[in-house]
Amino acid sequence: MDSSNNETTHEFPPYFKVYKDGRIERYPDRFGNGGQDLVPTGLDSKTGVQTKDVVVSPESGVSARLFIPKINGPDPKFPLVVHYHGGAFCTGSPFKKIFHDFLVSLALEANVVVISVDYRLAPHHALPVAHEDSWAAMQWISAHSNGQGPEPWLNQYVDFGRVFVAGESAGANIAHYVAVQAGATGLAGPNVIGSILVHPYFGGKEPDKMIDYMYPTKDRILYPEVDPNLSKMVGKKVLVCVAEKDWLKDRGVGYCETLRKSGWNGSVGYFESEEEGHGFFLWNPSSDKVVPLMKAMVDFINQN
């Protein structure tokens, strides 16, 4: 066998590596053991949260998972959180246990409907496909605001006057992108009140070799400071959550400063988890630092 077939040009553990012949091979998924951590939909007996999967686009194959809190009384209407998962744009899924369990908790604690988009992943689908899929999903969701969309749960249970976009890490980047797109190009139907960005992943001053490989341009998608539409971002408030020991903390802090200087007329909230690292609430959900982080998000959603 020709040993050159195994020569790599790029290696980005724990995500993927690129061979000299152009092949791309993913490392074992850090969010699930070979698919064994996929969680089926149904009723969560401990929380009363129900889940189902929906097809957003048959053409692209993009789907999403819906989370509905326990229903008490007739004709309930809940705020909606449109969520985008993390994973450096190249791994993760709302169907994985690590994200599913977190979103069950969010639906329960905030008493909201959550829809989490399973966008296509880089590098097999080059950036900005993840962002384009996520914006298309937001438009599909918005088509339900008149009660006539294709998904009954969205028609029946969502108060489209109270919509939020949210995400962690790369998903926070996508949530920001969707909010800016909604403000710059318009989004008919829903009232997007705010954005929740947890441990956001934006471009920084130091080179990021993996991002440079996946998206080799200093584009507004990764660098909000060069986005001429930043001040048009939809919503009246943003919550940025960082972790003290997260290597991305400075980028979250910088995002707050950039947004405040942009001319955007909303309020910028900031929450920091002490002594914790990137995505700790996913990897260690029993940490006592998860409770105040969740409370910050719940309060942000439920406060007028």
Residue ranges with predicted function:
Residues D2-N304:
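Alpha/beta-hydrolase superfamily serine-hydrolase fold, recognizing
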